[in-house]
């Protein structure tokens, strides 16, 4: 189960209630971080939800939403960095459906992660193996014998340049369940 918790009290309540993941975690405290790590609770940062509103703030988004976004964006980034640097488990998600955050554009979340200081390798793991683990899909998210062959073929090396994955123009082919 997931909880879209933003404030510290909501995060703690969700973790103590046994949620598998916290989406957003904007106002995470050290206490939240420690309890999440202790219980193995994932953080799903949903950077696109906040970043895309901020980046498109002049494109017709109501002023009160833009004002809230500006107030929380830096704190959201601090919480994610704090959790990542502490070694907390993270999985990728975007909260698609928020303004300028479209279904199918989830690859930009990797760029946002890397922009915050998450390594390219970790951003890929967060988006594949960790996401599959969070969803209870043990036979997906990694390249292993016996697992489903779900692969994105890209131009370039995402370990060197995350835009190989984050920029949809670099996507060459999708292999799903071993089929192109």
List each model region and its residues.
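A short helix-to-beta-strand connector/capping loop
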Residues: 39, 86-89, 170
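C-terminal cap of metal-dependent C-N hydrolases
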Residues: 127, 145-180
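Active-site core of metal-dependent hydrolases
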Residues: 1-77, 91, 96-97, 117-119, ...
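His/Asp/Glu-enriched, well-ordered alpha-helical/loop segment
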Residues: 73-157
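Extracellular/periplasmic catalytic domains that process cell-envelope and extracellular macromolecules
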Residues: 36-37, 85, 144, 165-166
């Amino acid at each position: 189960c997931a909880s879209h918790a933003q404030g510290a009290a909501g995060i703690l309540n969700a973790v103590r209630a046994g949620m598998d993941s916290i989406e957003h975690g904007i106002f995470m405290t050290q206490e939240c971080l420690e309890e999440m790590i202790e219980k193995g609770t994932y953080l799903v940062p949903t950077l696109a939800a906040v970043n895309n509103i901020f980046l498109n703030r002049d494109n017709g988004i109501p002023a009160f939403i833009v004002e809230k976004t500006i107030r929380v964006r830096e704190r959201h980034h601090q919480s994610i960095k704090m959790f990542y640097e502490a070694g907390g488990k993270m999985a990728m998600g975007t909260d698609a459906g928020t303004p300028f955050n479209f279904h199918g554009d989830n690859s930009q979340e990797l760029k946002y992660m890397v922009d915050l200081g998450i390594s390219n390798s970790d951003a890929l793991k967060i988006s594949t193996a960790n996401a599959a683990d969070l969803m209870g899909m043990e036979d997906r998210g990694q390249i292993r014998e016996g697992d489903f062959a779900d692969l994105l073929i890209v131009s370039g090396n995402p370990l060197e340049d995350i835009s190989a994955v984050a920029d949809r123009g670099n996507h060459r082919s999708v292999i799903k369940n071993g089929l192109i």
